[in-house]
C-alpha cells in the first residue's frame, strides 16, 4: 500500500450517498487514520455528472423486470473524475503517475471478501470503490471499467455503501500506524487463519447479581498468572478450539504443527469432560 513509502493511501468512492460515509470519517480508528494523513478519501456522486434537470442516474431494465438499473454515463463520468483525483494525489505525493488504482465494485455477485483478500489489496496500491444502488449497475460499465467485484456475504443490501465501508475499515486496519498497538492487527481473528481467543477485563470476578455460574464470573486464572508463555499457549488453544467449534472449514485449510494439534486435542478433551460432567 502507498503508506509503506510514507504517503497516504488514496481511496475514491463513487456513491449516490456520500453522507453515509460519515460513519468512518467521523468515528473511531478510521477517523484517526484520516486525521493522521494515513488515508485520503474522496467522494464522487454520479448525480453531479448528469445533464438533465432531474439528475437521472438510473433507468428501466431492458427485457423488463422490477426495479431500476444505474446508467453507464453518470457512473463513467464520476469514475473519470475519480481517476483525475488519483492522478493529482500521486503528483502531490511525488509518486509515479504510471501507477493505476484498482477499481472495485461491491456486489452480491462478487467473490466473498476475506482477510487474505484484504491483505492482498493492502499491498497493491490505491483504490476506487463503486457503490451501486437499485437493481444494480449496467453490465457494460462493469465490463469496461471494473477490475474486481467483491461481496461481503451471501445476502442483499440496499446499496454498496455499507460493503464499501466494511472494505475501507478492513484496509485501514492494515495500515502501519493506524492502530494504537501494532499487535492489535496481528492478533485479530483470521490473521493466522484462526478465530480470535476470548478477552477479559476488570473486575476479576463479576458480582452475584449477574446470575452467572461461579466459574463464568471469574477471569481464567492463567490470565492473572503473569506467565506470558502460559498465557500465549492458552490463547492459542482457545483460538484453535473456537475455530474447531465455529468454523471447522478454516481448520481444514491449515497445516497445524504437532504442538498446535496437541493443544486442540487438549481443548477437545476438556470440552468432552465438561459435557460428561453436565450429564
Curated annotation (Swiss-Prot):
<feature type="binding site">
    <location>
        <position position="132"/>
    </location>
    <ligand>
        <name>S-adenosyl-L-methionine</name>
    </ligand>
</feature>
<comment type="function">
    <text>Specifically methylates guanosine-37 in various tRNAs.</text>
</comment>
<keyword id="KW-0819">tRNA processing</keyword>
<dbReference type="GO" id="GO:0002939">
    <property type="term" value="P:tRNA N1-guanine methylation"/>
</dbReference>
<keyword id="KW-0489">Methyltransferase</keyword>
<dbReference type="InterPro" id="IPR029028">
    <property type="entry name" value="Alpha/beta_knot_MTases"/>
</dbReference>
<dbReference type="GO" id="GO:0005829">
    <property type="term" value="C:cytosol"/>
</dbReference>
<dbReference type="InterPro" id="IPR002649">
    <property type="entry name" value="tRNA_m1G_MeTrfase_TrmD"/>
</dbReference>
<keyword id="KW-0963">Cytoplasm</keyword>
<keyword id="KW-0808">Transferase</keyword>
<dbReference type="GO" id="GO:0052906">
    <property type="term" value="F:tRNA (guanine(37)-N1)-methyltransferase activity"/>
</dbReference>
<dbReference type="InterPro" id="IPR016009">
    <property type="entry name" value="tRNA_MeTrfase_TRMD/TRM10"/>
</dbReference>
<feature type="binding site">
    <location>
        <begin position="152"/>
        <end position="157"/>
    </location>
    <ligand>
        <name>S-adenosyl-L-methionine</name>
    </ligand>
</feature>
<comment type="subunit">
    <text>Homodimer.</text>
</comment>
<dbReference type="InterPro" id="IPR023148">
    <property type="entry name" value="tRNA_m1G_MeTrfase_C_sf"/>
</dbReference>
<dbReference type="InterPro" id="IPR029026">
    <property type="entry name" value="tRNA_m1G_MTases_N"/>
</dbReference>
<comment type="similarity">
    <text>Belongs to the RNA methyltransferase TrmD family.</text>
</comment>
<protein>
    <recommendedName>
        <fullName>tRNA (guanine-N(1)-)-methyltransferase</fullName>
        <ecNumber>2.1.1.228</ecNumber>
    </recommendedName>
</protein>
<keyword id="KW-0949">S-adenosyl-L-methionine</keyword>
<dbReference type="Pfam" id="PF01746">
    <property type="entry name" value="tRNA_m1G_MT"/>
</dbReference>
Amino acid at each position: 500500500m502507498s503508506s509503506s513509502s510514507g504517503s497516504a493511501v488514496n481511496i475514491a468512492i463513487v456513491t449516490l450517498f456520500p453522507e453515509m460515509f460519515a460513519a468512518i470519517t467521523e468515528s473511531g480508528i478510521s477517523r484517526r487514520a484520516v486525521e493522521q494523513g494515513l488515508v485520503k478519501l474522496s467522494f464522487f456522486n454520479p448525480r453531479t455528472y448528469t445533464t438533465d434537470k432531474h439528475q437521472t442516474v438510473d433507468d428501466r431494465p431492458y427485457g423488463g423486470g422490477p426495479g431500476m438499473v444505474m446508467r453507464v454515463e453518470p457512473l463513467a463520468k464520476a469514475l473519470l473524475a475519480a481517476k483525475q483525483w488519483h492522478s493529482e494525489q500521486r503528483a502531490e505525493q511525488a509518486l509515479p503517475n504510471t501507477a493505476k488504482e484498482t477499481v472495485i465494485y461491491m456486489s452480491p455477485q462478487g467473490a466473498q471478501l476475506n482477510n487474505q483478500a484484504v491483505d492482498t489489496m493492502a499491498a497493491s496500491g490505491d483504490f476506487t470503490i463503486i457503490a451501486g444502488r437499485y437493481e444494480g449497475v449496467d453490465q457494460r460499465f462493469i465490463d469496461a471499467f471494473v477490475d474486481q467485484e467483491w461481496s461481503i456475504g451471501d445476502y442483499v443490501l440496499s446499496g454498496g455503501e455499507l460493503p464499501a465501508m466494511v472494505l475501507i475499515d478492513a484496509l485501514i486496519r492494515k495500515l502501519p500506524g493506524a492502530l494504537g498497538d501494532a499487535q492489535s492487527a496481528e492478533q485479530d481473528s483470521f490473521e493466522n487463519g484462526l478465530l480470535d481467543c476470548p478477552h477479559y477485563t476488570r473486575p476479576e470476578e463479576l458480582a452475584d447479581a449477574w446470575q452467572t455460574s461461579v466459574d463464568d464470573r471469574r477471569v481464567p486464572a492463567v490470565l492473572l498468572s503473569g506467565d506470558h508463555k502460559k498465557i500465549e499457549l492458552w490463547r492459542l488453544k482457545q483460538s484453535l478450539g473456537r475455530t474447531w467449534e465455529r468454523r471447522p472449514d478454516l481448520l481444514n485449510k491449515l497445516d497445524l504443527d504437532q504442538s498446535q494439534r496437541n493443544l486442540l486435542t487438549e481443548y477437545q478433551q476438556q470440552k468432552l469432560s465438561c459435557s460428561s460432567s453436565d450429564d
